[in-house]
Amino acid sequence: MYLINLLAMIIPVLLAVAFLTLLERKVLGYMQLRKGPNIVGPYGLLQPIADAVKLFTKEPLQPLTSSPMLFIIAPTLALTLALTMWTPLPMPYPLMNMNLSMLFILALSSLAVYTIMWSGWASNSKYALIGALRAVAQTISYEVTLAIIILSLLLMNGSFTLLSMTTTQEYIWLLIPSWPLAMMWFISTLAETNRAPFDLTEGESELVSGFNVEYAGGPFALFFLAEYANIIMMNALTIILFLGAYHNPMVPELYTINFTTKTLLFTAFFLWIRASYPRFRYDQLMHLLWKNFLPLTLVMCMWHVALPIMLAGIPPQT
């Protein structure tokens, strides 16, 4: 039974990821005044299936000087972590209702750094290693602001459970009282998922393809799936934290429709940003975080700590 539950979550996520790649290519195509994929199937709808067949039937080549064990473990672990992060998300009911679901997601997203680091190191290539080092520095840096923003929101929520976020936001979205946090959170999720304009790890112009330069076929596809699963997961998390969907226990389907629509809109926003903005320089990326976001988030966190204490003496206004 547990296996069926797990598969009922994993398979739709992988399908969503497959068609997100198609959507991205279509959106970028139309933004650059061209068609995008339109040969395989009607309007190119079967392109993801063709891509999957092509990638998984290719020979998984390995460089002679690589560490074979780590080389294979890294992409497998990347996808495993990306899919495990979906388990505590309430949609409207989570697969695993944990007390510390928010901490669980933070811990797993920090573990994802290791997969990138191992893949860069195991490839035994200069480009891959530079890409991996950049990714590690970037991800660890932006984890800091993500953690502080989450802490501020949890102070308003009153618990670490994601399920209670829907109850907190019954009257007002948390986006409205904490919009500076939401703004910084969104930019940090872009950096966390290595998306443009923060895609320094895959800098085609200077690093060929970044940490996955030596990967081909199946293992490359696993990295690709992990990246896009993380993108959708981060957007889903943004919706849960800031734009809580209205949940009525009598009709839980409404929540799912509401939640999915918002997540898709945010994902489209990610693609729009990719088509519009140039890549940051590495020092600009670090300056943005350590000199702009970190002081601001710390101030906001102190404000959220002080607010309940300041207002504790006021009787409830009913």
UniProtKB/Swiss-Prot annotation:
Recorded GO CC terms: mitochondrial inner membrane
GO annotation (BP), single: mitochondrial electron transport, NADH to ubiquinone
Keyword Isomerase belongs to the record: no
Catalytic activity: a ubiquinone + NADH + 5 H(+)(in) = a ubiquinol + NAD(+) + 4 H(+)(out)
Topology within the bilayer: Multi-pass membrane protein
Residue ranges of coiled coil: none
Principal localisation: mitochondrion
Location(s) in or outside the cell: Mitochondrion inner membrane
Functional description taken from the UniProt entry: Core subunit of the mitochondrial membrane respiratory chain NADH dehydrogenase (Complex I) which catalyzes electron transfer from NADH through the respiratory chain, using ubiquinone as an electron acceptor. Essential for the catalytic activity and assembly of complex I.
Family under the similarity heading: Belongs to the complex I subunit 1 family.
Protein name, as recorded: NADH-ubiquinone oxidoreductase chain 1
Organism: Murina florium (Flores tube-nosed bat)
